Curated annotation (Swiss-Prot):
PANTHER family: GLUCANS BIOSYNTHESIS PROTEIN, GLUCANS BIOSYNTHESIS PROTEIN G. Coiled coil: none annotated. Its main location: periplasm. GO terms for biological process: beta-glucan biosynthetic process. Residues 38-60 are annotated as: Disordered. The keyword Calcium does not apply. This is Glucans biosynthesis protein G. Belongs to the OpgD/OpgG family. SUPFAM superfamilies: E set domains (SSF81296), Galactose mutarotase-like (SSF74650). InterPro entries: Gal_mutarotase_sf_dom, GH-type_carb-bd, Glucan_biosyn_MdoG/MdoD, Glucan_biosyn_MdoG_C, Ig-like_fold, Ig_E-set, MdoG_OpgG. Residues 1-34 form the signal peptide. Keywords: Periplasm, Signal.
Length: 545
């Protein structure tokens, strides 16, 4: 079993997949089944240039490489990324004092930023910023600069910014050892109280919150070679430039420089907190090599179990997950809902599309009773909705589901994969809007899937037949007539299809049985048809042994 370790904001730079055998990628779209495909093999159809051999930076005193004090404008990071990509990738070596490099988890956790030292704390601005110390798993030096009036000022490390508890027995260094990341605070929930709003720490990972949320799923700047047998490549944000916010603005802007063996990139994040915190992302990539296994706007989440697949989980909690489904608005006007699963084997699904309108990992179940966890409060985890800006063309929303036996592991990944590789030496620009919150997708007079459950079809005796129950919620008045239910499968036999009103849910309940026969993997698709036009989510599901 391979997965992403969940430790605060930590995401390791080791391989995600290693050498697990990939399952067939098979997704249902429109009125027909998608052709069954296999994930791309290691040998590409056309020759691909290998990344330049990385060179090691001498292990000497840490130096300011990117965030040097000086003039800064909207094109500064783009120029840096372009210059960086024109040279071979360099493995940066920024040694920590031995004591910090070998910190345990408890020791690292004992080094805390002193809120009194928060950036802009004494200026009465709507945002404040705090930095993370280096150490434990967070060994990389991340440079940070503050931008004001088109001037960037390098933010040097200061030991006075931090407090060390009783676990730490050594003095913090006086040299500029940099930081491992930072977090932004805002009066998100209560006037006068600066709560966490957003965190950048670990590779290109970041997280954000809407009002009333607790941290859950994460986003990344870029995904490379996810679910690849040779291992995943994790780009890193090497430097950040944070613009000083205005007194009367609900906006803070963060610029970031991304780097990895295959690509360099420039990112601009425009962050607006609220019930649903919106982040407008503008990015320009400069590939060193052809990017054929690239994921744009990637999200990473956790799904352990729910009513539609517990896999004999011995857990007092009915459901455990940060997200329970993948929602997609495709270019054909369809709204697709794909419940997540914790499979027994690695699963990769690709949902082909042209000009996607939106997609995201959603936490739809908001009832505490569904989780019964007084500490984790999964009902408060944010959903993340991605809206492409402009036409993203042909490609696919890719969903990766990784087996896991513990909630400490992130095992769900989603992103957009362009159909055509991004050529080496090119400049690739894309933009999108992220919405983090409890209800990031605007409600309409539509019918949405509210619950998916499955179990043995015959409660009296063992049987391979499976019973599926799909509940739909109607936003608005319920029509007099029942919709027609259409259920399709890529294999096996569908029987006993029943649709009924569900007054408890202001909607409908669809039930049907599946006889798998000799199949080990079956794609399912269910639609409700009304006599009058109405936006109805199409339910998709992958059944596996």
């Amino acid at each position: 079993m391979v997965s992403l370790l969940r430790c605060q904001s930590f995401k390791p730079s080791s391989s995600l997949i290693c050498s697990l055998a990939l399952s067939a990628a098979f997704a249902l779209s429109s009125s027909a089944f998608a052709e069954e495909t296999k994930p791309a093999e290691n040998k590409p159809a056309t020759p691909v240039v290998s990344p330049p051999k990385a060179t090691a930076q001498p292990a000497n005193k840490n130096q300011v490489r990117f965030t040097k004090t000086g003039t800064f404008d909207g094109d500064s990071v783009v120029k840096l990324a372009r210059k960086l990509a024109s040279k071979p990738y360099v493995v940066l070596k920024d040694p920590l004092p031995a004591g910090l490099a070998k910190l345990t988890y408890d020791e690292y956790r004992d080094i805390r930023f002193n809120p009194i030292s928060s950036i802009w704390r004494d200026q009465g601005l709507p945002f404040q910023m705090q930095m993370f110390h280096r150490g434990f798993y967070f060994q990389d030096l991340i440079e940070i600069a503050i931008v004001e009036a088109n001037q960037a000022t390098h933010l040097a490390y200061e030991p006075k910014y931090f407090t060390a508890g009783e676990v730490i027995t050594q003095a913090l260094p006086n040299d500029d050892i940099g930081y491992s990341g930072f977090r932004i605070h805002n009066q998100l929930n209560t006037n006068g109280v600066y709560d966490e709003l957003m965190v950048f720490q670990g590779a290109s990972y970041f997280r954000a919150l809407g009002k009333g949320n607790s941290y859950g799923l994460s986003a990344r700047g870029l995904a490379l070679k996810t679910a690849d047998p040779e291992g995943e490549e994790f780009p890193i944000f090497r430097a950040f430039w944070v613009e000083r916010p205005s007194y009367d603005s609900n906006l803070i802007v963060v610029h970031a420089l991304l780097d990895s063996p295959s690509v360099a990139g420039a990112y601009r994040f425009s962050v607006r907190p609220g019930d649903n915190t919106q982040i407008d992302v503008e990015a320009t990539l400069f590939p060193r090599v052809e990017l054929s296994k690239v994921g744009l706007a990637p999200s990473t989440s956790m799904f352990l179990h729910s009513l539609n697949g517990r896999h004999d989980t011995d857990d007092f909690r009915p459901e455990v997950h940060d997200s329970d489904g993948l929602l997609m608005f495709n270019g054909r006007g369809e709204h697709l809902w794909r419940p997540l699963a914790n499979p027994r084997q690695l699963q990769v699904s690709a949902f082909s599309d042209n000009s996607p309108q939106g997609f995201g990992l959603i936490q739809r179940e908001r009832n505490y009773a569904s989780y019964q966890d007084l500490e984790a409060h999964y009902e408060r985890r944010p959903s993340l909705w991605i809206e492409p800006v402009g036409n993203w063309g042909q490609g696919a929303v890719v969903l990766t589901e990784i087996p896991t036996e513990s909630e400490i592991h992130d095992n769900i990944v989603s992103f957009w994969k362009p159909r055509q590789p991004i050529p080496a030496g090119s400049e690739y620009h894309f933009a999108y809007r992220m919405s983090w919150g409890e209800e990031p997708v605007a409600k309409t007079n539509s019918v949405v899937v509210s619950r998916t459950a499955s179990g043995r079809a015959d409660i009296a005796k063992a049987t391979p037949r499976r019973l599926f129950v799909v509940d739909y919620h109607l936003n608005g008045a319920m029509p007099d007539e029942l919709p027609l239910a259409k259920v399709e499968s890529s294999g096996g036999v569908i029987s006993n299809v029943v649709i009924a009103r569900n007054a408890a849910n202001n909607g409908y309940r669809l039930a049907f049985e599946l006889e798998p026969e000799d199949k080990e993997l079956i794609e399912l698709r269910a639609e409700l048809k009304f006599s009058t036009p109405r936006q109805v989510e199409t339910w998709l599901y992958r059944w596996t042994l």
